[in-house]
Amino acid sequence: GWSAGVGTTIVLYAEDPQIAKDGCVHQGFIASRQGLPMIPALAETIAIAKYLLMIEATGVRAHFGLLSCGASVELIKIAKDKGLNVTCDVAMHQLHLTEQLIDGFNSLAHVRPPLRSENDKQLLRQGLKEGVIDTICTHHEPLSSSAKLAPFAETLPGITAFDTYVP
């Protein structure tokens, strides 16, 4: 393809819209109990798997932004082990926060991709330690306090991060 021929990197956000639909939180017990529309991990992992097949077929260089699932780390590791020219990052908050923060409809924890499970958090940290994840990003998306006042599912996703990322 064109990108492979000119040596550019394609930056990808991996989320299958048919699976994510109108979801706003990780598919889990808390979201289920609160009745919030969910985004299963499969929305990310299926998108990554599909992109990796295209990357393998075309030879393009690609960067996956904002990983949130432990299973995504495994897919990227397999791709790198196969010699595919892929890199990835994780948002800082995915390394420190989990879906537990949405308990009580805490809209300050409304981010996209959503905060995932404790297990996902640990696998993301492990992927970073092992060099599968190449870098940490801020995903700095501050919003006014009024943007977080509506019912959880109606609030905008976003979190401030730059002020805690830079010393």
For each of these PLM feature ranges, what is it?
Residues S146-T155:
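Basic, amphipathic juxtamembrane/active-site segments
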Residues G1-I136:
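Histidine/acidic residue-rich metal-binding segments in metalloenzymes
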Residues E44, E154-P167:
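Gly/Ser/Thr-rich active-site loops/lids in small-molecule metabolic enzymes
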